[in-house]
Amino acid sequence: MSDCYTELEKAVIVLVENFYKYVSKYSLVKNKISKSSFREMLQKELNHMLSDTGNRKAADKLIQNLDANHDGRISFDEYWTLIGGITGPIAKLIHEQEQQSSS
């Protein structure tokens, strides 16, 4: 990855690459991840951030609710929405911890 990318651009590239890593590794359907493979990806890739039971339950609920077309597979758009939904509560927690440490 080029050093000319900003930290945010690098993060986006990692998210995109991670999706396609699991598509090619686990999915028979092109450009989609099964729900079970997505859960496995979360366990491997976000294990520390989802160690809180509440975060894990919230992630499971999002997975159940987001499969818009009910095909049991997660498209890239669904994945992107899921990642946003999962990171929202984590971002809030990080912000609260930063507030506490600065006071």
Curated annotation (Swiss-Prot):
Keywords: Calcium, Cytoplasm, Metal-binding, Nucleus, Repeat, Zinc. Its main location: nucleus. CDD domains: S-100A13 (cd05022). It holds the Pfam family S_100. Ca(2+) binds at D67, N69, D71, R73, E78. Residues 12-47, 54-89 form the EF-hand domain. GO terms for cellular component: cytosol; extracellular exosome; extracellular space; nucleolus; nucleus; perinuclear region of cytoplasm; plasma membrane. Ubiquitous. Highly expressed in esophagus, adipose tissues and colon. Expressed at lower level in lung, brain, pancreas and skeletal muscle. Expression is up-regulated in tumors of bladder, lung, thyroid gland, pancreas and ovary. Expressed in astrocytes. GO terms for molecular function: calcium ion binding; calcium-dependent protein binding; protein homodimerization activity; RNA binding. GO terms for biological process: response to calcium ion. It is found in: Nucleus, Nucleolus; Cytoplasm. PANTHER family: PROTEIN S100-A16, S100 CALCIUM-BINDING PROTEIN. Homodimer. Interacts with TP53. Calcium-binding protein. Binds one calcium ion per monomer. Can promote differentiation of adipocytes (in vitro). Overexpression in preadipocytes increases their proliferation, enhances adipogenesis and reduces insulin-stimulated glucose uptake. S100A16 proteins, but not other S100 proteins, have only one functional Ca(2+) binding site per monomer. Upon Ca(2+) binding, undergoes conformational changes leading to the exposure of hydrophobic patches which could be implicated in the Ca(2+) -dependent nuclear export. Binds Zn(2+). Ca(2+) and Zn(2+) do not bind to the same site. Does not bind Cu(2+). This is Protein S100-A16. The gene is S100A16.
